[in-house]
Amino acid sequence: MGNEFRVCDDCQATNIKTLVPKLKKVDSCATIEVGCQSYCGPGRKKSFAFVNNRPVAAPTEDELIVKIEAKLNK
């Protein structure tokens, strides 16, 4: 089973136009779902994505990508 990324297109700290291409670089075969994730509180302040149904958040997109890569390499 492949990886799954879920991101919100409505949260203030998430920029879909830049985040989705970065996620594709991390895993080009992963499923990426864009839509509300009901994670509005943290999503107002931090970039986040759900990686295989687990939330991962960081102050910046670049830090988020580093955390996601670390999570997938475990």
Swiss-Prot record:
Q: What is the superkingdom listed in this entry's lineage?
A: Bacteria
Known InterPro entries for this protein? DUF1450, UPF0741
Can you list the disulfide-bonded cysteine pairs? none
Family from the record: Belongs to the UPF0741 family.
What is the name of the protein in this document?
UPF0741 protein BC_5384
- Source species, please? Bacillus cereus (strain ATCC 14579 / DSM 31 / CCUG 7414 / JCM 2152 / NBRC 15305 / NCIMB 9373 / NCTC 2599 / NRRL B-3711)
Organism phylogeny? Bacteria, Bacillati, Bacillota, Bacilli, Bacillales
